[in-house]
C-alpha cells in the first residue's frame, strides 16, 4: 500500500516540474518535446524541427538584435547609467536563452538519469512525508516564484504606464498614449521600424519572454535543488528510523549504494547546470549592485519608488531562495553524517564505516564551473561583498542625489529594470 501511495501520486521530477516547463516553452525556454507531467521520461526528446525550438531561436535572435540596437543607443548618447540599462538586460537575456538552448539538448539525458535514480526513493523503505509530498511541494515552490515574478513585472508595467501618462500630460506631448508608451519602453526597436498596432503582440511577447527567462534561471535552479534536497531528506529519514537498532551489513550496504546513486546524479547536475549557476550568480550580483547605486539617487514619483523597492526586494529574496536551496543539499548531507554519530559504537560495522567515509570525503554541493561551491559560506561571502560596495558608495555619493528632468525625453526616459 505504501509503495502504491508513492507511485500513485507520481512523485518524480518530471511530474513535479512538468507544468512549469510547459509554461516556459511558450516563452522560448528549454525547447524539448515530452515535458508534460503525464509523459514518461523516455519520451522526452530534443527535436530540431518543432514550434518550441522555433520560438526559442526567434527570441534568441531578437535578443541579439535588441542588444545591437541598444549598443547604438549607448554609442549615440554616451555611456551613462540610464542608457546602459537596456543593453545590460539584452546581454543577460542572450546568455540566458543561449544557456537554456544548450541545456535543452542535454535535458533528455538528465531527466532519464534522474528517473532511474528516483525509482529507489519510490520504494516502501523511503515512504515518508518528503516522498509523498515531493511533487506538491515542488509545484508550490514553482507557483510561488512565478506569482512573485508576475507581481514584480506588474509593478514595472504599472510604473511605466503611470510615467507615460505623466509624460503626455506634464510635458504636453501631442501623441497617442499607446504609441508613446511603446516608443518609451522599446526606443531601440523603433530606430529601425515604424510603430503600428500590428507590432504590439510581438513586442509584448518578446518583452514578456525576456523578462521570463531573466527570472526563470533562478526559478529552475530552485526547483532542481529543492528536489535533490528532498531526496537527501528521504535518506535521512530512513537512517533515523534505525538509529537505535543494530542493523546488518546488508542494510548499510543498500544505503551506501543508494547514496552513491544520488551522488552520481548530483555530479550530473553539477556538470550540466554549472553554466546556469555561474550566470545566475553573475547577473544577480550585477543587478543588486546597480540597484544599490540607484538607492542613493532620487527615484522620482511614488510609482517609481514603489517599483524600485519592490523589484530590489524581490530579486534579493529570489537569489537568496536559490542560494539557500542549493546550499541545503550539502547541509542535509552534513545532518545525515551527524545522525550517523548517534548510532552506538557497538552497532557500527564495515559498511556503516564506509558510508560514513563517503559523507566525510564528499562535499555534495553544486558548483559554478568548479570555481566556487554553492554553500552557506558563499552566501555570507556575497553579502559581505555587497556590504563593502555599499559602504564605498555611501562615502563617494554623500549629497550627490540628482534627479534628471522628467521632460528631457529621448533616451533614458523609461525605467528599465537595469536602470
From Swiss-Prot:
Instruction: Assign the protein's first listed, main location to one coarse class.
Output: membrane
Extracellular-side positions: 37-48, 104-139, 226-305, 399-419
Keywords for this protein:
Cell membrane, Membrane, Receptor, Transducer, Transmembrane, Transmembrane helix
Q: Where is the chain membrane-spanning?
A: 16-36, 49-69, 83-103, 140-160, 205-225, 306-326, 378-398
Highest taxon, organism lineage: Eukaryota
Query: GO:BP terms for this protein?
Result: monoatomic ion transmembrane transport; sensory perception of sweet taste; sensory perception of taste; signal transduction
Q: List the expressing tissues.
A: Expressed in Gr5a-expressing sugar-sensing cells.
Bilayer topology reads: Multi-pass membrane protein
Function field: One of the few identified sugar gustatory receptors identified so far and which promotes the starvation-induced increase of feeding motivation.
- What's the name of the protein? Gustatory receptor for sugar taste 64c
Protein source organism: Drosophila melanogaster (Fruit fly)
The coding gene here is Gr64c
Amino acid at each position: 500500500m505504501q509503495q502504491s501511495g508513492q507511485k500513485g501520486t507520481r512523485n518524480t521530477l518530471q511530474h513535479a516540474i512538468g507544468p512549469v516547463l510547459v509554461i516556459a516553452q511558450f516563452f522560448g525556454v528549454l525547447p524539448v518535446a515530452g515535458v508534460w507531467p503525464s509523459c514518461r521520461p523516455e519520451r522526452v526528446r530534443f527535436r530540431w524541427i518543432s514550434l518550441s525550438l522555433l520560438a526559442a531561436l526567434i527570441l534568441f535572435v531578437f535578443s541579439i538584435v535588441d542588444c545591437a540596437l541598444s549598443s547604438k543607443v549607448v554609442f549615440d548618447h554616451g555611456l551613462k547609467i540610464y542608457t546602459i540599462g537596456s543593453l545590460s538586460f539584452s546581454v543577460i537575456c542572450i546568455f540566458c536563452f543561449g544557456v537554456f538552448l544548450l541545456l535543452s539538448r542535454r535535458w533528455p539525458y538528465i531527466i532519464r538519469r534522474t528517473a532511474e535514480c528516483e525509482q529507489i526513493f519510490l520504494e516502501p523503505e523511503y515512504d515518508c512525508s518528503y516522498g509523498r509530498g515531493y511533487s506538491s511541494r515542488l509545484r508550490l515552490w514553482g507557483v510561488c516564484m512565478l506569482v512573485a515574478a508576475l507581481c514584480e513585472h506588474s509593478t514595472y508595467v504599472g510604473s511605466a504606464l503611470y510615467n507615460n501618462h505623466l509624460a503626455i500630460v506634464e510635458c504636453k506631448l501631442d501623441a497617442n498614449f499607446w504609441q508613446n508608451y511603446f516608443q518609451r519602453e522599446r526606443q531601440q526597436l523603433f530606430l529601425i521600424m515604424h510603430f503600428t498596432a500590428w507590432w504590439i503582440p510581438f513586442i509584448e511577447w518578446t518583452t514578456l519572454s525576456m523578462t521570463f527567462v531573466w527570472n526563470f534561471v533562478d526559478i529552475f535552479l530552485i526547483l532542481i535543488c529543492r528536489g535533490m534536497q528532498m531526496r537527501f531528506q528521504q535518506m535521512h529519514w530512513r537512517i533515523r528510523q534505525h538509529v537505535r537498532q543494530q542493523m546488518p551489513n546488508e542494510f548499510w550496504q543498500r544505503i551506501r549504494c543508494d547514496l552513491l546513486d544520488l551522488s552520481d546524479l548530483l555530479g550530473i547536475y553539477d556538470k550540466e547546470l554549472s553554466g546556469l549557476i555561474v550566470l545566475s550568480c553573475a547577473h544577480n550580483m550585477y543587478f543588486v549592485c546597480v540597484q544599490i547605486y540607484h538607492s542613493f539617487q532620487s527615484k522620482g514619483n511614488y510609482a517609481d519608488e514603489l517599483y524600485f523597492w519592490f523589484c530590489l526586494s524581490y530579486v534579493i529574496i529570489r537569489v537568496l531562495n536559490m542560494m539557500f536551496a542549493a546550499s541545503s543539499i550539502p547541509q542535509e548531507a552534513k545532518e545525515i553524517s551527524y545522525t550517523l554519530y548517534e548510532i552506538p559504537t557497538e552497532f557500527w560495522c564495515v559498511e556503516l564505516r564506509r558510508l560514513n567515509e563517503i559523507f566525510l570525503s564528499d562535499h555534495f554541493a553544486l558548483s559554478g564551473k568548479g570555481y566556487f561551491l554553492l554553500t552557506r559560506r558563499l552566501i555570507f561571502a556575497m553579502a559581505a561583498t555587497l556590504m563593502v560596495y555599499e559602504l564605498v558608495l555611501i562615502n563617494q555619493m554623500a549629497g550627490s542625489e540628482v534627479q534628471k528632468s522628467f521632460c528631457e525625453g529621448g533616451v533614458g526616459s523609461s525605467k528599465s529594470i537595469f536602470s
